[in-house]
């Protein structure tokens, strides 16, 4: 990353107390002279945090909620100005979702529900069902448009996302919308919980880092 002195980081939530690795990765890069712009799909939920997180929270730009005026206004402006490109973003999600890694085990269905309570069954479907995953991924199109425009306005040269699920789906779509290259760090559950879309996201990335096999 020697040539990337100005880059953005995207998190699903930031800061999160037990995810110290993301916090200290950003701190380490800043100490080495990188200009890091922080973005998060949602807030970290408050509560106690490491001392190093406090100044970074003030720097973090949180994506507006889906139904906010800022998000919907940006999305419908994009629909008016670039309708074909917006349509291609939705098509890219569906195409990537259909692609599976050869020989991958099927984690697209919820776990056996015989020992689960009703609430646990609902959560299992929400987190594991492939069709739910597709729906939640399609919802990221407006986020990618908003984020892509923000990154381009700020002159960001590269986007790095943590977790191979929704943050990387957003980065994948940002590249298609704004032409900004991305990389990502995958961890564990995000690789194995649902393997949909992963081949496309890996193929499009500048590089991938993972701590799991």
Regions found by a protein language model. Give the residues of each.
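N-terminal subdomain of nucleotide-sugar transferases
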Residues: 1-70, 152-154, 180, 207-211
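Histidine-centered beta-alpha loop that forms part of the nucleotide-sugar donor binding/catalytic region
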Residues: 11-12, 41, 164, 186-189
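Short, well-ordered alpha-helical microsegments
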Residues: 18, 167-170, 192-195
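A short acidic, amphipathic alpha-helical/loop segment
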Residues: 25, 170-174, 196-201
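A conserved catalytic-core segment of Leloir-type glycosyltransferases
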Residues: 43-135
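A conserved, positively charged/aromatic
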Residues: 131-132, 181-187, 192-206, 210
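An aromatic- and histidine-rich active-site surface loop
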Residues: 133-148, 156-177
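Helix N-cap/beta->alpha junction signal
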Residues: 163, 211-213
């Amino acid at each position: 990353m020697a040539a990337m002195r100005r880059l953005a980081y995207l998190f699903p939530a930031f800061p999160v107390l037990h995810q110290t690795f993301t916090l200290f990765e950003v701190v380490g890069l800043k100490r080495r002279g990188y200009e890091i712009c922080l973005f998060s799909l949602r807030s970290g939920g408050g509560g106690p945090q490491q001392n190093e997180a406090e100044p970074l929270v003030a720097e973090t730009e949180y994506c507006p909620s889906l139904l906010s005026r800022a998000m919907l206004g940006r999305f419908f402006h994009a629909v008016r100005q670039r309708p074909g490109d917006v349509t291609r973003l939705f098509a890219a999600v569906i195409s990537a979702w259909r692609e599976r890694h050869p020989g991958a085990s099927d984690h697209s269905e919820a776990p056996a529900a015989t020992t689960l309570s009703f609430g646990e069954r609902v959560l299992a479907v929400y987190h594991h069902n492939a069709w739910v995953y597709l729906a939640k991924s399609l919802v990221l199109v407006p986020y990618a448009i908003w984020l892509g425009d923000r990154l381009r306005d700020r002159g960001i040269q590269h986007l790095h996302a943590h977790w191979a699920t929704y943050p990387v789906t957003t980065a994948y779509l940002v590249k298609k919308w704004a032409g900004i290259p991305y990389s990502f760090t995958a961890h564990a559950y995000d690789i194995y919980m649902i393997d949909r879309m992963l081949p496309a996201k890996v193929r499009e990335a500048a590089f991938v880092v993972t701590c799991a096999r």
